[in-house]
Amino acid sequence: MKLSSHAFADNTAIPGEYAFAVPDAAHHYALSSNRNPHLAWVDVPPGTQSFALVCHDPDVPSVGDDVNQEGKRVALNLPRVDFYHWLLLDISAGAREITAGSHSASITAHGKSGPQTVGGLRHGLNDYSLWFAGDPQMAGDYFGYDGPCPPWNDERLHHYIFTLYALDVAHLEVQGALNGAAVLAALQGHVLAQASLTGTYTLAPDELLSID
């Protein structure tokens, strides 16, 4: 199985229209259009009953003390953790693409509704639900896609891995909260094939960024 996008090629930069924020010289960043990117796939294995899509960033700082702080940097060698940006379940076995902007076309304060979405699909909770938990203006359950917004003072280039799973079930049973860890656990034993596409993104100025 192969996964591709009209928006970006594998291991290249994600355009700003698909991000939560874009660089801004005066304020470090500005909010963006937050559209979900186009995705398409081929070479689906026989017996596929549905697809699941997971997008995660494995480069998120494990400690947030220096994140977006003037005069400080998030060190390249700081340990990193996963941050889930998109969980989309029960994609029809006959589907072969997701249209750009079909699941997100803006930033929604307090989060988009879910888990049910158009066409009988389900959206999981992305990790902005945790990130904004202490912010009265933004706190809420963030279902569906919300794009890149890495720290503007991070020395590390962030990678956004879109992984499509072909499954042997039409409806994926998920135990507990519909978050990244629960979805990955539910996938065990049901994956016929998988394919990934990686995009990169940063809000850091060139002089700060280190490419490892």
Can you name each region flagged by the protein language model?
Residues 1-212:
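N-terminus-centered regions that define maturation/targeting leaders and the start
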